[in-house]
Amino acid sequence: MSLVSTVNDAERTDLLNSSGNRNGPVVETVTTTAVEEKPITTKSVRGFSVYHKGGGAQLSKEALYRAKVKYGIYQSPARSFSTGVAEPKVASDVAANLANDNKTTIEAYKRLFVDPNANTAARRSIVNGGPRVEDVVIPESHYGSHQAATRAYSVASVATDENARRLQSPQSPPATRAHSLKSANKAFYNTKLPEQVEVVPKQVGKKPMDMSKILSSAENRAQHRVTDRWDPVKADHGIRTSTQNLNRVRSTSLTGPIYKERKGVKEPSSKDASATQGDRGNYAQWAAFAVRDMDPTALTNKEFEERERAKRELLSQITSQQVLAKARENADKQLDAIDANDVHRVLFGNDAYNRAAIEIAQRNAQRQAGETDVNEGKINIGGGLWLSPDDVHTIAREMVDPVLGEVHQRADDQRATDVDIKERNDYVTNEWNAWTAMHQTKENNNEALLVNSQNKRTREADSARSEAEKSFTELCDRMDKQVAERNDLLNQTKQAREQLERETEEKLAQNKEDNKTALRDLKGQHAKELEEAREEQRRLVQPYEERLEEVNREHESLVQERTAINEEIARLHESIKEHQYQISKYEREIKSHEEQNASAEEELKKLETDREGIQSHYNDNVVVNANKAKEQALLSSEEARLQNLKVDAIINERKTELNRTEQELQREKLNMLEAMRKTAEARGDENIDEERVKQLIGMTSTEYVEEQKKLQKAAGKAEKPKASTADKGQALDKALAHDQGDQEANTKDFKEGAETKAKESKGKPSQSVAKAIATSPTKTEAKAEPSTSKGKSNGVGTHPDNASGISQISDTLENGKHLSEEDLKELAEDAEQRVSGEPQPSYFKEVF
């Protein structure tokens, strides 16, 4: 039986307020505190209907569950710690006994807080005094158990008393009367804690409670429970692990390689195995040591692991249906063979064999029935020992009687204890009734005191109200007189204010008329001054606007000029590409003529009669060189013109930027003058601040206007002789076209003259041709000639006529000397280098 509860107050209140705990038995207890001779009697109501359903009944399932939840006891194999008791259902009893022996634990169950209603109870106790109840002394031997039992009974008392108060006054707070009284008495009498006061135990009741046997029984059960937990009995319902079983396991195909390693180990005998199995005390310890000392790497053989790994790899590679079908067939055959070798199936499946066995068994049974049995009516207990039922009953009675005697003794003790508890409960009930009557009397006195106090306060309030009304009436009369005086003064003040308002309105109307007249005159004067200032401003701004328009026109002309220059540059780029293509073409022709010249020289050594044909080839080579020189001259001239145009474009861009800057400057000046004009208008001045303008611009506005007029006149005079860059570009294109026509004519005349002279000099030696090549114009000279002609066409010089060019070639051919082959080769190489060389700097100087 549980005598103590360790649940907190909130859980206990919720538990006892439930519907199942409202009908518990009522038990009254008396708790005495020896402090200043002021004992305290409390009412306790037991409501443990869940734990005890009747006299001598066992704990219910709900009570057992709550006890397990309370103490953390769960019947689960996963929990390895012990609860300290033999059976979970007696955990509450064991906990109560332990709490009785442990003084520190007892203090943990006591209420050490002050109830919220302690203040009210203390105030009431001051009037009526504390309760006068005879002290009840508790024996020292039963002081702990008495406190534990009282504590257990007080749990139900709280719930029952609280439910009763709820039924009487639903709006009252949840605090109980017992708690309030106890807290009030402690607060009023300055009660100390129980551990600080020495309690003198005295005998209570007729017979003291002897719990020695109960405690000894609980200790024995707890020891038995701990032993079962530390040394559990292993339940083995299968095959014993004996030598025969080891041999049977060793014979299997899978574990054979593992047990080969244990051939040298001595196998235990069946007797030793039985002894080992019988020693259950060291089972858990051996299992723990085995787990601690287990090496996972030494469980299996390395060769067996390799073989199993190879087997798994082989099985993973078998994916063919034929292989699987063959495997199934082999497995079926093996199963059939196993079924055929099953002795039990063959034995009990043979009908003839079974019939013969039944007949033999019947004959043996009939023969044994005819024989006399010596041990008839006895029980075979094994080992050839037969006992009669009387002997068995005698042995059982001798073994059970001591236990039953102890049980009967404990039952008698428990009954005596229950009787003692009942007597004590009756005594406490009587004491409680007396205390309740006394407390009722005290409450009646308190209520009477409250009624008297209320009547006294009512009389005092009536007298105070009459005094206040009298004072208020006097105050109202005095205030009415003051209000009348204030009203008279207010009327006089209103009359004075009306007179002042009339005078002020007349003055205000006169001031408005005067202000309107002055405002009209001022507006006319300001309009006239504003018109004059605007005229002056327009006169000052006019030069800036004209200058701005002029700069815009100049900017547009420069933009057009730049566009024309860009178009001319693009055209010259295309012309340069065309000339470069012609030069590469002529270079290819020169290479082909050089190859023909080399072959012609070889043929010239063999055939003297073909001199005329070879001479014509040399003449063609000269013409090609002349054309190449012409194209290079045109290319150089166009590159020079391109450079000039680029320079002009850069100059044009700079001029454009300068004009743009000038425009920004003119705009800023105009904005500045406009701002100064607006400032002057805002101030009401007729003219702008000339000193400020001179400080900012460097001159006055009048001087600035005169200077702008002079600049406009000078710009008009300069526009007449000025020619645009586009017209210059067109004149230059015409000059280049004229020069190109002159060069083509000179080339044609030169070619015809060379052919004529070649026919005339047919009979002369071939060395004259080499001399002509040596004396022919080089690349630099060929470039110089067209550049000179170009310069003359532009006013620098004139082109050489065709007659002079032909005479020059003919003189070269006629004056040619006989040269050796080595000299001819050197002259040819020199001519090639000159033709393929870069133009000389002097040529570019003449061009630029």
Swiss-Prot record:
Tagged with keyword RNA-binding: no
Residue segments, region Disordered: 1-26, 218-279, 496-520, 712-848
Transmembrane intervals: none
InterPro entries linked: Eisosome1
Cell compartments where the protein resides: Cytoplasmic granule; Cell membrane
Pfam families in the cross-refs: Eisosome1
Assigned keywords, A-Z: Cell membrane, Membrane
Cellular compartments per GO CC: plasma membrane
tRNA-binding recorded as keyword: no
Biased composition (Polar residues): 240-255, 764-779, 786-796, 804-813
Membrane topology designation: Peripheral membrane protein
GO BP: eisosome assembly
Protein family membership: Belongs to the EIS1 family.
Its job: Required for normal formation of eisosomes, large cytoplasmic protein assemblies that localize to specialized domains on plasma membrane and mark the site of endocytosis.
Protein name: Eisosome protein 1
Organism, as annotated: Zygosaccharomyces rouxii (strain ATCC 2623 / CBS 732 / NBRC 1130 / NCYC 568 / NRRL Y-229)
Gene: EIS1
